[in-house]
């Protein structure tokens, strides 16, 4: 046993040893081991377990050996007990044997199990200990941190205390300094005020002295001006006299020179020139007219001769001159030019022969030898002939000087620079210089025949102006005379590109005429450049005058160049003959150069000149053989920019061919036939398109007749046999082509009926239909199409008739061709389509037709619009009929129609192109440029917005809008703008755009006036005047998706909005639910700052009352403030409830107590305060007595605690005590401007918030509200101030302000009206009468009853009403006041015209006074300073005597009764009046004749009379009548006032008659009526008391001594704000303090 016990001892010692090792293991922290160490520890532990298992297995295998060893190895023979035991065990059976001692294996297993349990228990205890240790460490760390923070806060608190002490000390010091400074500033202010008064006095004195000096200076200036005018007149007279003397001297010198030359020529034996003889009888007449240039004197004798004007017959009805015969010769241009016949005798009796040639030597430039008619004249130079001058009073240009000149001139005007601009070697350069000097400096006629004068150097008196006209005509005459010598040669025509004749080139001879030039003729110096000749002869817009008569030459034996001489009977044209030449307006060169300029090269000699705007007649053209060739293709219209500059009104260039002999034969038979057939009223520009052919050729005549539209000649020619009607000229054009080109429908019909080829094209491939379409001749085109012309024919360049029509903008032709089914897609050789042509020319209507005409929409609109265009808005909604390929067709350069429109800035065309849904705006040309790359700025903006989505932005008002009386048209959302969302728009851009739109809207509605959005400066950071900004936005809804500013989605805005089909963006503002008042501010237009201030007052004082005039939104403000306060308290965790009660006349104090108790405002004294917040709103407190209703609650409300209880006794006699707790808020509303009587006792116990009509927030509320309403109607845009809607809104604002101002002046504050009634003003653009009707209803339903009640209550406030109905005097006062208010406040400024307003006058309840008595209340018809409707009113009594009058009316006519007021005492005064009264009851008017007397001593009507007197006796000037009465006439009762009583003349008027308070009508301002005994006749200068009562027009007209002053009684339209605490004498009171 000892062995067993000894052997077991080591086994049982294991667990204690492991237990003793636990404290050592505590130092081993598993949490601090790394991952690798933890893996090592795990592996070690696993190895230990495996080793333990091996040991156990080994012990089990060796248990027998161990047992034997333990049992027998230590036994010996010394112990007998051991031997016995051994024997016992060996002898007995194994089953019966019992172990002597415990099995060691079982002991080992038990020990091992016990060790395992202990190990698990210790591990659990170790883990718990570790967790507790960790928690303890964490708490220790937190405690340490808190201790550190506590130390820091303590230190900071000490620092703040020190700083606060320093700040307090500094503030105290600053307060002391400021107080001392205030005293010093007060002293300085007093000193400055005294100095200011002194300066004002000095300034007044200086102003008086200055005004005196101004008067003196003005008088001196007037005298100086008079003297200067006299000096100017005298100077001009002397100048005129000097010019006459100079002219006379020059004429005498000229006569002397000519006589000397004549004598010399006679001596040489030149007797064959009878034209050189000068009749002496005419020399005397020459001295009567001055021909000198007004601004220059003659430089030398030779120059004076060269610049003398040549006479031109100006009056065709004067006696014709004697023709000077001339022999046929081959003389040069000068010789032929000097043999022209004379002209008409001037009106001054002065006349010269055109054959007077004065010769003088030319030493500077030797001229070549020249051939003269009767032999050479060596060394002689022809000079212009002097002539007389006749003033052309009718501004008619002079007729032709010679027929030869008319046949050879190529000028559109005699005075045109291109008329005589050619330089010829046979002329003296001094002559040319003089000629162009007159052309450059003279204020000659412009190209339309109008006299265009340059500003004269001095033009003071009429004499100088007359002299200027004389000088002007002198210059014109000289220019005409010189043009004859510098005109082109008749026999030397030249093409525009031919060499100049002066440079050595010579033209072919014509008709036997020999050239006068020699091949070696030197060039003449051309001097300075001449004015630029006109380049657009086809732009003349003057009508075509009658065609000139054909002049038949009698001398058939003369050559062609001798045709200058004509018979004297035919040489003078009839009075209706057109001026010689063609006047063509040059749009590019209207301003002429003032310096002399040399002549340009001649553009070519054309055949006979015709009047402006007319084509050349066929006969006249054929006489010279001038046939005009056409450009390739049909000619452009006369106003086309590409037309060449030629003299006649044609649009194609022409090369002039030599004259054929046959064409000049005057005896040709067909010439007479054409002449006899009659000229058409209008000659076309394109007369022929063939070469020079004989006039006898029938095809030529056929072309000419077709071109001119001569149906008679054309029908004669078509009836001839053997005529080829399809004959083509050199350019390939036929007669049908010419007729179609010139728009002669009858000729086209004749040719087509004669089987002319309808598609016969010219050399360039243009058919008659192409020509008609290009020129816009729709009737011709319609005929050609009816005869099956090819509508898709393409010329050589690919131009189709549709292309040409689009190019020239001929919409009717386009429509005709489209109806005929022409192809829109045919391209030219350059790749252009008709769409390109229409866009290139900028024809919007043509492009619209191309894109939309032919569809169902255009068919429907065609019945409404004859042109088929329809409105552009309708075409935008229609579907285009052209394909996408055609709209995107590119030319050779890759340009589409969009490229062309964008590059030229044609925004309208580009907008129509963009209307096609399949336009490829991003298509590039061959240079990789899109339409956007080549576009202008406007077109770039249009292209950027091509695919943009237009999303309207709205601001939700919801249920926060104020309840408006009678308004049912308020919208829950207001549209503020429309955003363009493009594909490239990001969410940041979208957020900025929305924010900017909201900010702009806030700024617009709160700005002054109708300023446009672009005129205002906006900034996101700044708030509007109402306090709203971007921060006021709560959320934004994109359709049904909620979005906030700055938020982004995965899709871009464009895709997101298009996918969700968002049509508008709704902006929600922060409201009372969020504890904010932004939405309330926007809904009511009350500034946010003021609402926040009201909320603060309710939270701070708990007892607040809002009071103001009726309709000042007191109830709305109280409810919104309570709602916001409720949500704020709820958000803070306090339950809150709003209790609303409406007070009426039957509302008792017991009901109020029950309300307080039920709402938990009053709680029993024994009950502790509750945490529930209660807001009680008492509305309409003005209907009850405040002292009776709230008198017992004043102390408990002011001191809320159980110490100040309120004892309430119930009906059963039980009395309970209650008190108000701190969580109760009481808000009241009163529709009254001020308290009176006993109610003033309640005032000090509440916080009162006054809502004044003339102060914010009420003063500008109506303006902001109506402006927002107007902007909503105009989709967020601000209309122009001139828009009728703006004018009607301004009128409504003026009505409200003027109405309250007048009521304030009348002393009736209870009648003041808030803006609530005016918020329902209808805004209907284009229907101003709707607003006027609404105003009449508002007047009848609200304004008039309130005014009537207020006036009656004022008049009878001193005594109770004895009678159930108002007396006649009271009714008279009410009607007079209503008439005053109607005309002064309501009708004044109405934008409706007078006639329209007359129709609505019967709807206003104020009487039936004729509207003619009302002054110009429409502000649009009078200037602001002239408006007589508003006058500054000061109702203090007048101190001067005046005149009074009385007016009475009957039903049919107004009759005047004298009202005499005798001077007397109180008991002797009486007033007699006759009043017409119209009863409005049951709609039947009744006339009441009141003949009763109102005693001034009675207490019944005296107050009313005094009130009427007070109204009519203000210091403002009245426009109705004067009250003729002395200040001593009325002495009523003893008055405490020291000032004399104002005068009064009672006037009874109908309540429906419109009148004016401060001005009524343009009646006489000082009518003389029957006056009192003391003042029988009014004197001028005596101050008169003004009456505001209406006066009939007929009576005023009878007694008005000066009717011209009827409209002069107007004053400035200025008003100032009326303040309730003004002086008593500045009010219109309806009751005086009478003792």
Curated annotation (Swiss-Prot):
UniProt GO cellular component terms: cell cortex; dendritic spine; FAR/SIN/STRIPAK complex; glutamatergic synapse
Keywords linked to the UniProt accession: ANK repeat, Cell projection, Coiled coil, Cytoplasm, Methylation, Phosphoprotein, Repeat, Synapse
Basic and acidic residues compositional bias, start-end: 193-205, 264-274, 1453-1463, 1615-1624
Asymmetric dimethylarginine: modified positions: 484
Gene designation per UniProt: CTTNBP2
Gene Ontology biological process: regulation of synapse organization
Subcellular location: Cytoplasm, Cell cortex; Cell projection, Dendritic spine
Biased composition (Low complexity): 320-331, 375-395, 439-453
Annotated stretches, region: Disordered: 1-20, 193-219, 264-469, 483-582, 856-876, 1420-1469, 1531-1624
Polar residues composition-biased segments: 402-414, 454-466, 858-869, 1432-1452, 1546-1555, 1563-1577
Entries under CDD domains matching the protein: bZIP
Coiled coil (residue ranges): 116-273
ANK repeats: 697-727, 731-760, 764-793, 797-826, 830-859, 893-923
Protein name from the UniProt record: Cortactin-binding protein 2
Species annotation: Ornithorhynchus anatinus (Duckbill platypus)
Function recorded in the entry: Regulates the dendritic spine distribution of CTTN/cortactin in hippocampal neurons, and thus controls dendritic spinogenesis and dendritic spine maintenance. Associates with the striatin-interacting phosphatase and kinase (STRIPAK) core complex to regulate dendritic spine distribution of the STRIPAK complex in hippocampal neurons.
Record-linked PROSITE patterns: ANK_REP_REGION (PS50297), ANK_REPEAT (PS50088)
Sites bearing Phosphoserine, chain numbering: 1498
Self-association state and partner proteins as the record states: Interacts with CTTN/cortactin SH3 domain. Interacts with STRN, STRN4/zinedin and MOB4/phocein; this interactions mediate the association with the STRIPAK core complex and may regulate dendritic spine distribution of the STRIPAK complex in hippocampal neurons. Activation of glutamate receptors weakens the interaction with STRN and STRN4.
One Pfam family matching this protein: Ank_2
């Amino acid at each position: 046993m000892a062995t067993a016990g000894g052997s077991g001892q080591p086994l049982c010692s294991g667990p204690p040893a492991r237990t003793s090792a636990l404290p050592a293991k505590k130092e081993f922290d598993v949490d601090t081991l790394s991952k690798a160490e933890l893996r090592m520890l795990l592996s070690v532990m696993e190895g230990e377990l495996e080793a333990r298992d091996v040991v156990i297995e080994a012990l089990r295998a060796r248990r027998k050996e161990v047992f034997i060893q333990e049992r027998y190895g230590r036994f010996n023979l010394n112990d007998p007990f051991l031997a016995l035991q051994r024997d016992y065990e060996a002898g007995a059976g194994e089953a019966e044997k019992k172990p002597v001692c415990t099995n060691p294996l079982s002991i080992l297993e038990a020990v091992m199990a016990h060790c395992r349990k202990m190990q698990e228990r210790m591990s659990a205890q170790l883990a718990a200990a570790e967790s507790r240790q960790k928690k303890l460490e964490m708490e220790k760390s937190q405690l340490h941190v808190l201790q550190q923070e506590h130390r820091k806060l303590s230190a900071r608190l000490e620092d703040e205390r020190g700083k606060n002490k320093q700040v307090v000390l500094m503030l105290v010091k600053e307060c002391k300094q400021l107080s001392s400074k205030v005293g010093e500033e007060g002293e300085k202010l007093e000193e400055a005020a005294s100095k200011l008064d002194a300066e004002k006095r000095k300034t007044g004195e200086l102003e008086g002295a200055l005004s005196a000096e101004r008067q003196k200076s003005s008088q001196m200036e007037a005298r100086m001006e008079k003297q200067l005018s006299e000096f100017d007149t005298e100077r001009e007279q002397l100048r005129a006299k000097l010019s006459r003397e100079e002219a006379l001297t020059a004429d005498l010198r000229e006569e002397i020179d000519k006589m000397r030359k004549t004598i010399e020529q006679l001596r040489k034996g030149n007797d064959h020139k009878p034209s050189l003889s000068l009749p002496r009888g005419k020399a005397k007449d020459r001295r009567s007219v001055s021909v000198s240039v007004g601004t220059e004197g003659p430089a030398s004798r030779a120059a004076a001769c060269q610049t003398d004007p040549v006479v031109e017959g100006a009056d065709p009805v004067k006696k014709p001159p004697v023709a000077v015969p001339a022999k046929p010769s081959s003389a040069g241009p000068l010789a032929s030019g000097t043999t022209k016949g004379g002209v008409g005798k001037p009106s001054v009796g002065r006349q010269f022969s055109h054959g007077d040639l004065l010769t003088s030597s030319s030493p500077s430039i030797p001229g070549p030898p020249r051939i003269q008619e009767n032999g050479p004249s060596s060394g002689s130079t022809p000079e212009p002939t002097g002539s007389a001058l006749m003033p052309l009073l009718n501004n008619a240009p002079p007729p032709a000087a010679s027929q030869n000149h008319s046949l050879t001139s190529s000028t559109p005007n005699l005075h045109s620079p291109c008329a005589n601009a050619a330089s010829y070697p046979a002329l003296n350069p001094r002559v040319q210089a003089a000629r162009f000097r007159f052309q450059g400096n003279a204020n000659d006629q412009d190209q339309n025949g109008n006299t265009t004068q340059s500003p004269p150097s001095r033009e003071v008196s009429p004499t100088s102006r007359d002299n200027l006209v004389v000088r002007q005509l002198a210059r014109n005459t000289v220019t005409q005379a010189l043009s004859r010598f510098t005109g082109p040669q008749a026999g030397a025509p030249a093409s525009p590109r031919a060499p100049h004749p002066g440079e050595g080139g010579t033209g072919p001879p014509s008709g036997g005429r020999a050239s006068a030039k020699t091949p070696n003729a030197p060039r003449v110096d051309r001097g300075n450049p001449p004015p630029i000749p006109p380049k657009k002869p086809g732009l003349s817009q003057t009508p075509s005058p009658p065609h000139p008569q054909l002049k038949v030459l009698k001398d058939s034996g003369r050559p062609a160049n001798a045709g200058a001489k004509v018979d004297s009977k035919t040489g003078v044209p009839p009075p209706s003959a057109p001026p010689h030449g063609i006047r063509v307006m040059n749009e590019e060169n209207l301003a002429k150069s003032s310096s002399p300029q040399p002549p340009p090269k001649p553009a070519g000699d054309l055949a006979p000149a015709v009047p402006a705007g007319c084509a050349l007649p066929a006969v006249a053209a054929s006489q010279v053989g001038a046939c005009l060739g056409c450009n390739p293709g049909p000619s452009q219209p006369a106003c086309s920019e590409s037309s060449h500059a030629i003299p006649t009104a044609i649009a194609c260039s022409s090369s002039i061919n030599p004259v054929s002999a046959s064409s000049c034969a005057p005896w040709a038979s067909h010439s007479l036939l054409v002449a006899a057939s009659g000229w058409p009223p209008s000659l076309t520009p394109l007369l022929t398109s063939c070469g020079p052919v004989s006039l006898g050729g029938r095809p030529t005549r056929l072309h000419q007749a077709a071109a001119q539209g001569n149906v008679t000649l054309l029908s004669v020619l078509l009836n001839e046999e053997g005529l080829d009607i399809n004959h083509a000229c050199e350019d390939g054009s036929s007669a049908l082509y010419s007729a179609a080109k010139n728009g002669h429908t009858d000729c086209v019909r004749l040719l087509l009926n004669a089987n002319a080829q309808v598609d016969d094209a010219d050399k360039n491939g243009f058919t008659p239909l192409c020509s008609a379409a290009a020129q816009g001749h729709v009737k011709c085109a319609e005929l050609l199409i009816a005869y099956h012309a090819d509508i898709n024919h393409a010329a050589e360049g690919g131009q189709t008739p549709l292309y040409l029509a689009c190019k020239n903008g001929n919409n009717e032709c386009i429509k005709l061709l489209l109806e005929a089914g022409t192809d829109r897609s045919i391209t030219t050789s350059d790749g252009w389509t008709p769409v390109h042509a229409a866009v290139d020319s900028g024809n919007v209507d043509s492009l619209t037709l191309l894109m939309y005409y032919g569809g169902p929409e255009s068919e429907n609109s065609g019945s409404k619009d004859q042109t088929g265009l329809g409105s552009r808005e309708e075409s935008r909604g229609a579907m285009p009929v052209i394909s996408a390929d055609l709209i995107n067709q590119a030319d050779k350069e890759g340009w589409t129609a969009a490229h062309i429109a964008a590059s030229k800035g044609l925004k309208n065309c580009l907008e129509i192109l963009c209307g096609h849904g399949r336009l490829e705006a991003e298509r590039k040309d061959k240079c990789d440029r899109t339409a956007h790359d080549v576009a202008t700025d406007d077109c770039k903006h249009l292209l950027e917005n091509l695919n943009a989505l237009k999303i309207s932005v709205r601001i939700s008002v919801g249920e926060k809008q104020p309840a408006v009386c009678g308004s049912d048209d308020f919208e829950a959302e207001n549209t503020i703008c429309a955003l363009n969302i493009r594909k490239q728009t990001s969410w940041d851009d979208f957020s900025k755009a929305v924010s900017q739109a909201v900010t702009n809207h806030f700024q617009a509605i709160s700005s002054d006036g109708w300023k446009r959005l672009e005129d205002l400066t906006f900034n996101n950071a700044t708030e509007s005047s109402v306090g709203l900004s971007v921060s006021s936005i709560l959320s934004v809804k994109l359709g049904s998706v909620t979005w906030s500013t700055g938020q982004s989605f995965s899709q871009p805005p464009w895709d997101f909005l298009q996918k969700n089909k968002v049509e508008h963006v709704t902006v929600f503002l922060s409201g009372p639910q969020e504890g904010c008042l932004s939405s309330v501010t926007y809904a009511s237009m009350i500034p946010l700052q003021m609402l926040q201030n009201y909320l603060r007052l309710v939270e701070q004082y708990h007892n607040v009352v809002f009071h103001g005039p009726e309709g000042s939104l007191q109830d709305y403000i109280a409810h919104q403030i309570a709602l916001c306060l409720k949500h704020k308290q709820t958000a803070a965790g306090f339950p809150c409830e709003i209790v609303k009660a409406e007070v009426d006349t039957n509302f008792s104090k017991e009901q109020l107590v029950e309300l307080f108790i039920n709402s938990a405002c009053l709680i029993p004294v024994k009950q502790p305060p509750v945490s529930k917040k209660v807001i009680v709103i008492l509305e309409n407190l003005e209907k009850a007595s405040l002292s009776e209703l709230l008198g017992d609650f004043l102390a408990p409300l002011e001191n809320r605690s159980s110490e100040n209880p309120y004892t309430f006794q119930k009906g059963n006699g039980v009395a309970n005590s209650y008190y108000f707790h701190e969580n109760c808020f009481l808000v009241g509303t009163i529709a009254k401007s001020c308290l009176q009587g006993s109610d003033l006792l309640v005032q000090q116990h509440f916080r009162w918030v006054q809502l004044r009509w003339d102060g914010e927030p009420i003063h500008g509320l109506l303006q902001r509200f109506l402006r927002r309403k107007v902007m909503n109607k105009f989709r967020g845009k601000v209309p122009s101030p001139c828009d009728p809607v703006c004018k009607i809104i301004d009128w409504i604002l003026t009505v409200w302000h003027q109405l309250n101002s007048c009521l304030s002046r009348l002393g009736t504050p209870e009648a003041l009206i808030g803006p609530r009634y005016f918020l329902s003003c209808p805004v209907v653009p284009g229907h101003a009468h709707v607003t006027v009707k609404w105003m009449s209803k508002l007047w009848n339903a609200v304004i008039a009853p309130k005014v009537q009640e207020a006036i009656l209550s004022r008049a009878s406030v001193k005594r109770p009403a004895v009678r159930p109905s108002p007396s006649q005097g009271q009714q008279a006062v009410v009607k007079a006041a209503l008439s005053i208010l109607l005309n002064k406040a309501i009708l004044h400024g109405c934008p409706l015209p007078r006639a329209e307003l007359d129709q609505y006058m019967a709807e206003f309840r104020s009487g039936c006074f004729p509207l003619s008595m009302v002054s110009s209340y429409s502000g649009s018809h009078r200037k602001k300073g002239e408006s007589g409707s508003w006058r500054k009113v000061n109702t203090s009594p007048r101190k001067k005597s005046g005149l009074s009058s009385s007016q009475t009316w009957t039903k049919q006519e107004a009759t005047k009764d004298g009202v005499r007021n005798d001077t007397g005492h109180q008991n002797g005064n009486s007033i007699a009046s006759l009043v017409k009264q119209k009863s409005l009851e049951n709609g039947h008017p009744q006339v009441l004749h009141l003949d009763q007397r109102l005693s001034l001593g009675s207490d019944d009507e005296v107050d009313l009379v005094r009130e009427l007197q007070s109204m009519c006796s203000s210091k403002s000037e009245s426009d109705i009548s004067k009250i003729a009465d002395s200040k001593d006439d009325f002495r009523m009762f003893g008055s405490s006032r020291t000032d004399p009583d104002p005068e009064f003349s009672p006037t009874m008027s109908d309540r429906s008659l419109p009148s004016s308070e401060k001005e009524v009508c343009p009646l006489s301002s000082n009518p003389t009526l029957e006056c009192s005994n003391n003042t029988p006749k009014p004197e001028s200068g005596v101050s008169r008391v003004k009456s505001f009562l209406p006066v009939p027009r007929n009576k005023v007209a009878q007694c008005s001594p000066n009717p011209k002053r009827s409209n002069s009684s107007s004053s400035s339209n200025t008003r100032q704000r009326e303040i309730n605490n003004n002086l008593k004498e500045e009010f219109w009171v309806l009751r005086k303090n009478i003792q």
